């Protein structure tokens, strides 16, 4: 059968890739508006698949800040690089803590909730992410990770909670405990990690 002259074959090489925000302009506008309203210290970057950089607030949770939080966190929230992936919003972005940056050994142990590449473990599986969810929910979880990380470093928490502290206030009293421990002149010491030197 002869080939019709009006048929064209598009090869992968002939296709020009576009960024997710070109394919999803409404989602891009929504993310930018929500982040500007809730996390104004973050700056958008269009490098790669885009993302945000900056410092998260110490306590963006929907309950009162526990006494001693500023002492435990050294007066600053988590500095992050948030890297979207081109499949966003079908897949969540990766959140990389910059300050404080987890130690290499902490990226190999589940109890720190850090992946091997240094990004935060946000979900038990990526299928928990709902593409309709606000991106700000992930930023709140990252800020809360910073609190649990400080509590572990202070030795008042042995491992991070399974579901995080965003919706669970059970560990809030530990913030005051860690602050009082620091105020009493005792140095905050990271819990001994089995099999590590030192």
Go through each PLM region and give its residues.
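UBC/E2-like fold recognition across ubiquitin and ubiquitin-like conjugation systems
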Residues: 1-77, 87-198
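Extended lipid/amphipathic-ligand handling interfaces
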Residues: 80
């Amino acid at each position: 059968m002869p080939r019709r002259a009006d048929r064209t074959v598009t090869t992968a090489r002939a296709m020009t890739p576009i960024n997710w925000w070109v394919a999803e302009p409404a989602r891009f506008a929504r993310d930018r508006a929500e982040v500007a309203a809730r996390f104004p210290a973050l700056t958008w970057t269009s490098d790669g698949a885009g993302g945000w950089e900056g410092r998260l607030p110490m306590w963006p949770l929907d309950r009162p800040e526990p006494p001693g939080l500023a002492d435990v966190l050294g007066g600053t929230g988590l500095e992050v690089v948030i890297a979207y992936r081109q499949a966003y919003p079908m897949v969540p972005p990766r959140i990389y803590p910059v300050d404080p940056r987890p130690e290499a050994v902490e990226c190999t142990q589940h109890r720190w909730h850090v992946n091997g590449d240094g990004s935060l473990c946000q979900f038990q599986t990526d299928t928990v992410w709902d593409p309709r969810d606000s991106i700000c929910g992930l930023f709140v979880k990252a800020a809360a990770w910073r609190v649990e990380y400080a509590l572990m470093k202070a030795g008042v928490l042995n491992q991070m909670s399974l579901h995080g502290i965003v919706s669970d206030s059970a560990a809030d009293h530990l913030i005051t405990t860690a602050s009082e421990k620091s105020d009493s002149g005792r140095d905050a010491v990271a819990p001994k990690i089995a099999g590590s030197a030192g």
